[in-house]
Amino acid sequence: MSTLICSFDGLHDNRVLRYYADFEAHILHMDTQTEAGEKVSVHFTGLLAHWFENVVQDNILFGMDEISVDAFFEQYKDLLGGAISYGFPACCSIEELRDRMDREHIRVDSSLGLCGFVLAQEVELQCP
């Protein structure tokens, strides 16, 4: 079974201009710019959690992929094992988190370059 569900090719090598999370509205918004100077926005809704590392000015996205729930738990098992008892990414056990992700169809998207993940129900790319 493939762990890759979908690749978002329109983000390859885009520079991250800004991102913000609104926890009350359950959204995460990221503005990026292509090498040609075109703006591409990524809008996540139904936000459960996000985790990014190596965040610096002028991060470049290698890409963004939606991966299976099983692949997510395999890729981030060490992070989850150490953080779940502190309420991240959700105040529940790993088994309850997996059930919730299956039940709510939470999408799993990971970006490379700016490494990490976003757990959200929907994602939309907006190109002006």
Task: Please tell me what each predicted stretch does.
Residues 1-128:
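Surface-exposed, interaction-prone regions used to assemble/regulate multi-protein complexes
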